[in-house]
Protein backbone atom coordinates (compact mmCIF):
# COMPACT_ATOMS: atom_id res chain seq x y z
CA UNK A 1 0.00 0.00 0.00
CA UNK A 2 1.22 3.51 -0.79
CA UNK A 3 1.13 6.01 2.08
CA UNK A 4 1.94 9.67 2.63
CA UNK A 5 3.97 10.08 5.81
CA UNK A 6 6.70 12.07 7.54
CA UNK A 7 10.34 10.99 7.25
CA UNK A 8 12.57 12.38 10.00
CA UNK A 9 15.72 14.27 9.19
CA UNK A 10 17.73 16.97 10.87
CA UNK A 11 20.15 16.64 13.75
CA UNK A 12 19.87 15.45 17.32
CA UNK A 13 17.35 17.67 19.17
CA UNK A 14 16.68 19.57 15.88
CA UNK A 15 13.99 17.56 14.07
CA UNK A 16 13.03 18.24 10.47
CA UNK A 17 10.48 16.19 8.57
CA UNK A 18 10.06 15.56 4.86
CA UNK A 19 6.55 14.70 3.74
CA UNK A 20 7.00 11.73 1.42
CA UNK A 21 4.97 9.28 -0.62
CA UNK A 22 6.30 5.78 0.10
CA UNK A 23 5.46 2.10 0.10
CA UNK A 24 4.24 1.16 3.58
CA UNK A 25 6.74 -1.74 3.71
CA UNK A 26 9.74 0.62 3.51
CA UNK A 27 11.41 2.05 6.61
CA UNK A 28 10.21 5.42 7.92
CA UNK A 29 13.36 7.21 6.79
CA UNK A 30 14.10 4.84 3.91
CA UNK A 31 13.26 4.68 0.24
CA UNK A 32 10.40 6.86 -0.98
CA UNK A 33 8.63 7.56 -4.27
CA UNK A 34 8.27 11.35 -4.13
CA UNK A 35 8.84 14.23 -1.70
CA UNK A 36 5.68 16.35 -1.51
CA UNK A 37 6.56 18.82 1.23
CA UNK A 38 8.29 19.45 4.54
CA UNK A 39 7.55 20.34 8.15
CA UNK A 40 9.99 22.12 10.46
CA UNK A 41 8.55 22.16 14.00
CA UNK A 42 11.45 24.30 15.27
CA UNK A 43 11.39 27.00 12.59
CA UNK A 44 12.64 30.37 13.77
CA UNK A 45 10.54 33.51 13.45
CA UNK A 46 10.27 34.47 9.79
CA UNK A 47 11.24 31.00 8.52
CA UNK A 48 8.80 28.82 6.63
CA UNK A 49 7.73 25.94 8.87
CA UNK A 50 5.41 24.05 6.54
CA UNK A 51 5.17 23.59 2.79
CA UNK A 52 2.96 21.11 0.95
CA UNK A 53 2.53 20.51 -2.79
CA UNK A 54 -1.25 20.14 -2.61
CA UNK A 55 -1.56 19.23 -6.30
CA UNK A 56 0.81 16.26 -5.84
CA UNK A 57 -0.90 15.16 -2.62
CA UNK A 58 -4.26 15.23 -4.40
CA UNK A 59 -2.76 13.24 -7.30
CA UNK A 60 -1.40 10.53 -5.00
CA UNK A 61 -4.64 10.35 -3.02
CA UNK A 62 -6.50 9.82 -6.30
CA UNK A 63 -4.13 6.89 -6.94
CA UNK A 64 -5.07 5.38 -3.57
CA UNK A 65 -2.34 6.71 -1.25
CA UNK A 66 -3.41 6.96 2.39
CA UNK A 67 -2.07 9.91 4.44
CA UNK A 68 -1.04 9.28 8.06
CA UNK A 69 -3.01 11.03 10.82
CA UNK A 70 -0.25 13.60 11.35
CA UNK A 71 -0.01 14.32 7.63
CA UNK A 72 -3.80 14.84 7.48
CA UNK A 73 -3.53 17.45 10.25
CA UNK A 74 -0.60 19.21 8.55
CA UNK A 75 -2.37 19.31 5.16
CA UNK A 76 -5.46 20.80 6.82
CA UNK A 77 -3.28 23.37 8.62
CA UNK A 78 -1.45 24.31 5.40
CA UNK A 79 -4.72 24.56 3.47
CA UNK A 80 -6.23 26.92 6.06
CA UNK A 81 -3.09 29.10 5.92
CA UNK A 82 -3.37 29.29 2.14
CA UNK A 83 -7.02 30.39 2.37
CA UNK A 84 -6.14 33.15 4.87
CA UNK A 85 -3.20 34.33 2.73
CA UNK A 86 -5.33 34.25 -0.42
CA UNK A 87 -8.16 36.32 1.08
UniProtKB/Swiss-Prot annotation:
InterPro entries: Ribosomal_bS16, Ribosomal_bS16_CS, Ribosomal_bS16_dom_sf. Belongs to the bacterial ribosomal protein bS16 family. It comes from the Bacteria. Transmembrane segments: none annotated. One of its GO terms (molecular function) is structural constituent of ribosome. GO terms for biological process: translation. This is Small ribosomal subunit protein bS16. Pfam families: Ribosomal_S16. Gene3D superfamilies: 3.30.1320.10. Keywords: Ribonucleoprotein, Ribosomal protein. It comes from Nitrosospira multiformis (strain ATCC 25196 / NCIMB 11849 / C 71). GO terms for cellular component: cytoplasm; small ribosomal subunit. PANTHER family: 30S RIBOSOMAL PROTEIN S16, SMALL RIBOSOMAL SUBUNIT PROTEIN BS16M. The keyword Hydrolase does not apply. The keyword Iron does not apply.
Amino acid sequence: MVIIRLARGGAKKRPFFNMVVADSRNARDGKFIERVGFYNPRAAEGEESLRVKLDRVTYWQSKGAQPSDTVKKLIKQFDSRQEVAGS
